[in-house]
Amino acid sequence: MIPLVPTSKTEIDKLEHVLILGTLFRPEILELIKDPIEKVTWVDSLAIAAGALAREKAGYTIREIADELGRTEQTIRKHLKGETKAGKLVRETYEMMKRGELNIEEVEKFLEAVVRKEELEKITDIKKLEEEIEKLKKENEELAAKLEKVKEKLKEVLSELEK
């Protein structure tokens, strides 16, 4: 369940992600972002507007939001007041969520799939690292054995030289 009034950093992140994705997947927005240049601008603006609104709902001040998102207080105010297109759209998405008009289940499923994919990638990375560690351990053992042989030979040579 996505909280409309987040009380933790995790809940803020969830609300922020749902606001971004919920806004992006609205049909009118999909039309607006067909142009690749527009897409980059829109995604950034939507991300900032969604982050600002999620933090505002959690009780953050304008200054705290601006500091955390790396934007000016003026930019944050404009997004929160709906003076920017992105801010207006994100607020509309939030209101749709409140009224139960946004299919959050699909967005939640998408987010869960992304998280699962990231977890699988981490597990794969861990397995690769474990294999590399085993390979290095074996190599280390082989080198240690060779070093012991060299030490033995050196002792033999020194022993012969002393005679």
UniProtKB/Swiss-Prot annotation:
Organism: Methanocaldococcus jannaschii (strain ATCC 43067 / DSM 2661 / JAL-1 / JCM 10045 / NBRC 100440)
Stored InterPro entries: CHP03879_regulat_dom_put (IPR022285)
Name used for this protein in its record: Uncharacterized protein MJ1053
